[in-house]
């Protein structure tokens, strides 16, 4: 099955503690049905100091389920993603506007 959301897409969170937040997808895990979104679902990682690296509390974006994300169209509104053929090529398009993504 083709991926509706890909790395680099601008998305909005639909549910959970980060509902309404927007960000860019930095990684997608299709087998787990999850994605990592910049600045969303952030956890604090405590690291021990080493001779080469300073320790402390580092913020790390954790994976979020794809069902809780929606793509942002050109107008900045949440949209569903569809597929269609343009010539010989299969393309993704925003269902709200019909524009090719």
Swiss-Prot record:
The keyword rRNA-binding applies. Keywords: Ribonucleoprotein, Ribosomal protein, RNA-binding, rRNA-binding. InterPro entries: KOW, Rib_uL2_dom2, Ribosomal_uL24, Ribosomal_uL24_CS, Ribosomal_uL24_KOW, Translation_prot_SH3-like_sf. Signal peptide: none annotated. Part of the 50S ribosomal subunit. GO terms for molecular function: rRNA binding; structural constituent of ribosome. It comes from the Bacteria. GO terms for cellular component: ribonucleoprotein complex; ribosome. Pfam families: KOW (PF00467), ribosomal_L24 (PF17136). This is Large ribosomal subunit protein uL24. The gene is rplX. One of two assembly initiator proteins, it binds directly to the 5'-end of the 23S rRNA, where it nucleates assembly of the 50S subunit. One of its GO terms (biological process) is translation. Belongs to the universal ribosomal protein uL24 family.
């Amino acid at each position: 099955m083709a991926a509706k959301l890909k790395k680099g897409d601008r998305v909005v969170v639909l549910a959970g503690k980060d509902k309404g937040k927007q960000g860019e997808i930095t990684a997608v895990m299709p087998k787990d049905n999850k994605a990592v979104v910049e600045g969303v679902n952030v956890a604090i990682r405590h690291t021990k100091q080493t001779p080469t690296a300073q320790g402390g509390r580092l913020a790390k974006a954790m994976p979020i389920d794809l069902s809780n994300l929606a793509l942002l169209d050109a107008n900045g509104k949440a949209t569903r993603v569809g597929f269609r053929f343009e010539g010989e090529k299969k393309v993704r398009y925003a269902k709200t506007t019909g524009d090719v993504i």
